Amino acid sequence: MTPNRRSTDSYNMLGASFDFDPDFSLLSNKTHKNKNPKPPVKLLPYRHGSNTTSSDSDSYIFNSGSGSSDAETPAPVAPIFISLEDVLLNGQLIDFAIDPSGVKFLEANYPLDSEDQIRKAVFEKFTESTTLFVGLCHSRNGNFIVQKLVELATPAEQRELLRQMIDGGLLAMCKDKFACRVVQLALQKFDHSNVFQLIQELSTFDLAAMCTDQISIHVIQRVVKQLPVDMWTFFVHFLSSGDSLMAVCQDKYGCRLVQQVIDRLAENPKLPCFKFRIQLLHSLMTCIVRNCYRLSSNEFANYVIQYVIKSSGIMEMYRDTIIDKCLLRNLLSMSQDKYASHVIEGAFLFAPPALLHEMMEEIFSGYVKDVESNRDALDILLFHQYGNYVVQQMISICTAALIGKEERELPPAILLLYSGWYEKMKQRVLQHASRLERFSSGKKIIDSVMRHGVPTAAAVNAQAAPSLMELTAQFDAMFPSFLAR
């Protein structure tokens, strides 16, 4: 009898007779046609004389269930221990592999010694047919024993497993929620040459489709996180194309992947490979800057732009480029967009002083007033459903600077700028207070400019221009040797 035969047959293992139904479930409570069905025999882990499941149990017993509500209790059956060799000799390896309890038994008892004959026989059985191997990879339970094979495989066994994956349809495995685990583990455990061959095969697939699939994207993420950058340069080149970048960034899964690629390319500038990585990063960021306006207005792609703006280190130069080349001169229109307004908020928060000054001045005086309504940009944003959040961010930035909550200490001259911006917004808010009070957002804006503890412009101006006595004291502190003469 072939070991993977799908039929209702009676098996005998070490004196215990039990049935297998067509779904291969060792725990099946199959209903028999006869009136007095024989209770099915179940495979249970045996530990310290009890039938409790344990991850470290390596002994299994056959035990019969009650199966009947009769008052008469059947005589207890003595436990019968089995081994991996017993399963192999009785041709039930596949049945165990696709059963939830059986596969745990196989995992627990798979030999660690690569020269073990039982291990070799088990490996050969699972890889004798590509159809069988792929079926196990796609199986809810079978994928666990395949992962065990991958984890402990020798280089020769790795090559065989790799051949099976490629011949059996690697792309389909990547898109399957169970088989993709096998591919991910192979990327992590295989040696360099076999991983390189696996990557070469992945590079031939439709990468845009993989990056926007909620299952196969995990394979690409594993590549980006685990492998050296020089093994997936093809993926950076793929993203550096405008159409490819837009397709991936506009997807709710793909946008996060692009952020991970940026993070990996920009990490640890002290490593020798950073020069190579910075070239790839520049290629990708050039494409992102070129498409910044479209990305900022997309539901998911805007997160990529926000991520760049909020990043530090080497990414600050790209943050400044995005603000200068993409956001400036477009602040009013982007602030009124549902998604781009988040980008503008982040830009105000993380912009360096020079660019922040340009952004503030653009909102205050960079646009011609509307002829019909006589409203300027600040008036428009105050009452806009998205733009009001940008104004709130502007007020918050000025308030934080004036009350000393900035991380860095600002010189008096810079504080004067913040004070001037704050006073302009405060006066405009108070001018429109009666209308703003009708909206919850307007009430928040009014509250933000009426906060106590924010110094007035006069106070800041006085701080910026120290008195003669203060200048003398500062001089004395700087040059104490002069006084000692």
Curated annotation (Swiss-Prot):
Q: Where is this region: RNA-binding?
A: 439-454
State how changing residue 441 to A affects the protein, per the record. Answer: Reduced RNA-binding activity
**Annotated Pumilio repeat ranges:** 86-124, 128-163, 164-200, 201-236, 237-279, 287-324, 326-361, 370-411
Whether Glycoprotein counts among this entry's keywords is: no
State its role. Answer: RNA-binding protein that binds to the consensus sequence 5'-CUCUGUAUCUUGU-3' in mRNA 3'-UTRs and modulates mRNA expression and stability. Functions redundantly with puf-5 and puf-6 in oocyte formation and organization, early embryonic cell divisions, and repression of expression of glp-1 and other maternal mRNAs in late oogenesis.
**Anything else the record notes?**
Puf-6 and puf-7 are >98% identical on both nucleotide and protein sequence level. Experimental approaches often do not distinguish between the two genes, which are collectively referred to as puf6/7 and are considered to be functionally redundant.
Please report the name of this protein according to its UniProt entry: Pumilio domain-containing protein 7
Which species is this record about? Caenorhabditis elegans
